[in-house]
UniProtKB/Swiss-Prot annotation:
PANTHER family, per the entry: 50S/60S RIBOSOMAL PROTEIN L16, LARGE RIBOSOMAL SUBUNIT PROTEIN UL16M
UniProt GO molecular function: rRNA binding; structural constituent of ribosome; tRNA binding
GO BP term, pick one: translation
Ranges for region Disordered: 1-23
Keywords linked to the UniProt accession: Ribonucleoprotein, Ribosomal protein, RNA-binding, rRNA-binding, tRNA-binding
Protein name: Large ribosomal subunit protein uL16
Compositional bias of kind Basic residues: 1-19
Entries under Pfam families matching the protein: Ribosomal_L16
Family: Belongs to the universal ribosomal protein uL16 family.
GO CC terms, sorted: cytosolic large ribosomal subunit
Organism superkingdom: Bacteria
Quaternary structure and interacting proteins, as annotated: Part of the 50S ribosomal subunit.
Length: 144
């Protein structure tokens, strides 16, 4: 699972979930990508589950890039505990995903395989998403 090596502060405020993604909106490494169309928190477990679903379908072919990272801790108090008495313990790590953000990128496989692999990954995630190509978004090309 993904989590930061070290953090300056153990607990944070809840992040904003309004607006569109400011960065990471283009397919930069691969040929195809999975782009979020709604806002949500994605946990490190959900990212790992989606990655496994994609790589199993592609069977050692192609390359996968994970374009999101869970930097933000989220806390939870134990069950049947009264309100107050401080903030709860860190339960896990989340990545805040807003519309337009590229979640995963794939290269080295045919379009049909990439489309199906990203579709399987999208079923593991709490956001609605769509399949995009590098040419459609105007991403940089690797040609000199």
């Amino acid at each position: 699972m993904l989590l930061p090596k070290r953090v300056k502060y153990r607990r944070q405020h809840r992040p904003k979930t309004t607006g569109r993604s400011k960065g990471g909106n283009y397919v930069t490494f691969g040929e195809y990508g999975l782009q979020a169309t709604t806002t949500s928190w994605i946990t490190s477990r959900q990212i790992e589950s989606a990655r496994i679903a994609m790589t199993r379908y592609m069977k050692r072919g192609g390359k996968v890039w994970i374009k999101i990272f869970p930097h933000t801790p989220y806390t939870k108090k134990p069950l049947e505990v009264r309100m107050g008495a401080g903030k709860g313990a860190v339960e896990g790590w989340i990545a805040v995903v807003k519309p337009g953000r590229i979640l995963f990128e794939v290269a080295g496989v045919p379009e049909e395989v990439a489309r199906e692999a990203l579709r399987l990954a999208s079923h593991k995630l709490p956001v609605k998403s769509k399949f995009v190509k590098r040419e459609e978004l105007g991403g940089e090309t690797n040609e000199s």
